[in-house]
From Swiss-Prot:
Disulfide bonds: none annotated. It catalyses: adenosine(37) in tRNA + dimethylallyl diphosphate = N(6)-dimethylallyladenosine(37) in tRNA + diphosphate. The record marks T108, R130 as: Interaction with substrate tRNA. This is tRNA dimethylallyltransferase. Belongs to the IPP transferase family. It comes from Methylobacterium radiotolerans (strain ATCC 27329 / DSM 1819 / JCM 2831 / NBRC 15690 / NCIMB 10815 / 0-1). Its EC number is 2.5.1.75. The keyword ATP-binding applies. Pfam families: IPPT. Its cofactor is Mg(2+). GO terms for biological process: tRNA modification. PANTHER family: TRNA DIMETHYLALLYLTRANSFERASE. It comes from the Bacteria. It is an enzyme of class 2 (transferase).
Length: 308
């Protein structure tokens, strides 16, 4: 339902638009920014990377030229970019907008949380420790790594799914680098740049069946428009396979295809399935984690006038 009359007559400090992948967030954000002289600000953890415009469905150059877009493709794939990096970049950007309306859009819940609730600063991990954990993980199931973590940091292990390889390895790195459990660094978060501000929070919740169809169709369109070539260039860089850019939806399967382990159709099917599963997790996470301050909107019936 539309906002009440008092709320609708008051311009917010920022608009936040979230939703599952392929729900139409980017197009809506561009329309809102164009209508109100705003700036679209990426809030998606994969669209920050310069290496994967097509595979992450970043706005194309024409779209970016029509209305200002920021924090898209500004990070090299070799960087392990985090919610903390994003929050600092967003704070610096907000200071330059000169009164223009910021429209944050994306699907990464932790980035939205960092904007309002802040983030905990984790210590740097030496490359030698990263290499030690990576070597220890080679050929071992994630559940075994989780058991290793439980011996060193039972509280940290209890917070993580035994199948969440990236976060389990990160917690192991922190413990080995500092001798402290990862939770000990969570007590004093850095404030978020939008904390206490007047915000419009919109979550796009499309029909599930229609969303699955859009995800599958979009993945094939990405391939037709050059996503496989993007992944080939990324593969040639020989980056650490645990980096976020190497784990983007579609990348592992397409690399397996380039290595001869999968047919292209098999790689596409894997990418589609991974993306559908991710969309389901996004819906679940926002429903349980972000509270009632967010308006859930069917994108099929949403208009710019309804949302501001």
């Amino acid at each position: 339902m539309p906002p009440d009359r008092e709320e609708a007559g008051r311009r917010p400090a920022a608009i936040l638009i979230a939703g599952p992948t392929a729900s139409g967030k980017s197009a809506l954000a561009a329309r809102l920014a164009e209508r109100h002289g705003g700036v679209v600000i990426n809030t998606d953890s994969m669209q920050v990377y310069a290496d994967l415009r097509r595979l992450t469905a970043r706005p194309d150059p024409d779209e970016e030229a029509r209305v200002p877009h920021r924090l898209y493709g500004h990070v090299d794939g070799a960087v392990n970019y985090s919610a903390g990096h994003f929050s600092r970049d967003a704070a610096a950007l907000l200071a330059t907008l000169g009164g223009r309306l910021p429209v944050f859009v994306g699907g990464t819940g932790l980035y939205f949380r960092a904007l309002e609730q802040g983030f905990s600063e984790l210590p740097p991990v030496p490359d030698t420790v990263r290499a030690r954990v990576r070597d220890a993980a080679e050929g071992r199931p994630t559940e075994a790594l989780h058991a290793d973590l439980a011996r060193h940091d039972p509280e940290g292990a209890a917070r993580l799914r035994p199948s969440d390889r990236m976060r389990v390895m990160r917690a192991l790195e922190i413990f080995l680098a500092t001798g402290r459990p990862i939770a000990s660094f969570y007590g004093d978060p850095v404030p978020g740049p939008l904390a206490g501000r007047d915000l419009r929070r919109i979550f796009l919740a499309p029909d599930r069946a229609a969303l699955r169809e859009r995800i599958d169709a979009r993945f094939r369109t990405m391939i037709a428009e050059g996503a496989l070539d993007e992944v080939a260039r990324l593969r040639a860089r020989r980056l650490d396979p645990m980096l976020p850019v190497m784990r983007a939806h579609g990348v592992p399967g397409l690399i397996a295809h380039l290595d001869g382990a999968l047919s292209l159709d098999e790689a596409i099917a894997r990418g589609q399935a991974d993306t559908r599963a991710y969309a389901k997790r996004q819906l679940t996470w926002f429903r349980h984690q972000m509270g009632e301050a967010w308006r859930w909107v069917d994108p099929e019936g949403a208009t710019v006038e309804d949302l501001l």
